[in-house]
Design a protein with these regions (language model features):
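Hydrophobic beta-strand positions in extracellular immunoglobulin-like domains
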Residues: 132-134, 166, 278
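A short, structured loop/turn motif at beta-sheet edges
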Residues: 15, 117-125, 153-156, 224-230, ...
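Active-site/ligand-binding surface loops and adjacent short beta/alpha elements
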Residues: 172-241
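Beta-strand-rich N-terminal accessory domains
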Residues: 1-71, 75, 163
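Beta-strand-rich recognition/accessory modules
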Residues: 233-290
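Acidic (Asp/Glu-rich), glycine- and aromatic
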Residues: 17-34, 147, 153-196
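Extended, loop-rich substrate-binding clefts of extracytoplasmic carbohydrate-active enzymes
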Residues: 55-156
Length: 290
């Protein structure tokens, strides 16, 4: 492990495998290499600056507490701020946007902050246990997060297991119904469908047209990384995250979204778990025998 400017870089036999980044607005994983050394992730593309490798977020998070601090402005619109939210809000509501923060042009802004990281190195791989806080732009705490990211090098694929627990602090918190929420992967530009890549799910359905909004046990995204090589990333939700629709796009992002159709209220101390295994492999989905 090498630590450099809030990056925890993982190597196996001298080969760079992945890095866990603290980030300015949220923690994320980037880069992530296949055994042959091809990076399968993209960070902050021009079309969506908030798509940072592998990360977690939610567009509509609100604290359900009665009191004067929740008085909201009657101003409306995406560009406005609310007194309680203290930062960019979701289309004029009192919910805080923890999804698109990196794309906002004005501050102060909400942030997902790493408070501590414990590292464990074993034969299985390297695990990072992080205590994380979701705070709005006025530093109100909305969610406590406990995240474990385990990086394992392999001959057929390099593996990242990311499991996170989102917990309400001393008051109930609502995670509203949202299109933009969940556990996100943004694939490397050359892998996306628009540049010759391909999305395949467990049922054999292909690309955005056939896979978007469907429930599937796994999704693979692969494409050309050089003139002669193909690489990709497979995502396998953990049992607690299985059964939710996939957001798959031909231009590069895919994510698991438990809040696509229904909101969720977490009572004080109550937690919700979301997670997945990510496999960076060489070759196509079929070549890698996903």
């Amino acid at each position: 492990i090498r630590e450099l400017q809030k990056q925890l870089k993982v190597y196996a036999d001298g080969e760079y495998v992945a890095a866990v980044q603290e980030g300015k607005f949220r923690p994320y994983v980037y880069p992530f290499f296949t055994p042959a050394g091809h990076n399968v992730l993209q960070i902050a593309p021009a079309d969506h600056l908030h798509h940072v490798g592998i990360c977690v977020g939610h567009e509509f998070v609100s604290r359900l507490v009665d009191g004067p601090e929740l008085e909201t402005s009657d101003r409306d619109g995406w560009e406005e701020y609310q007194p309680y939210a203290g930062g960019r809000t979701a289309r004029g509501s009192d919910a805080v946007d923890f999804w698109g923060t990196e794309s906002f042009l004005l501050g102060p802004l909400p942030r997902i902050l790493v408070r501590s990281t414990n590292t464990d190195v074993s034969e299985r791989g390297v695990s990072f246990d992080q205590e994380i806080e979701w705070r709005d732009a006025e530093d109100y705490l909305l969610l406590c997060e406990r995240r474990r990211t385990t990086v394992t090098a392999g001959s057929d694929a390099n593996i990242i297991d990311l499991v996170t627990n989102l917990e309400a602090p001393g008051y109930p918190v609502e995670l509203r119904k949202a299109k933009d929420a969940g556990l996100l992967v943004r694939v490397a530009d050359q892998i996306d469908v628009l540049d010759g890549g391909r999305i395949v799910n467990a049922e054999g359905r292909v690309n955005e047209e056939q896979t978007f909004g469907r429930v599937s046990a796994w999704v693979d995204y692969s494409g050309p990384v050089t003139r002669d090589a193909v690489a990709g990333i497979s995502v396998f939700p953990i049992p607690e995250s299985d059964g939710h629709p996939w957001h798959t796009r031909d231009y590069g992002p895919m994510w698991i979204n438990p809040w696509q159709h229904e909101p969720m209220t977490l009572q004080p101390g109550q937690a919700y778990t979301i997670g997945a295994r990510f496999a960076a492999h060489d070759g196509s989905c079929e070549d890698a025998d996903v």
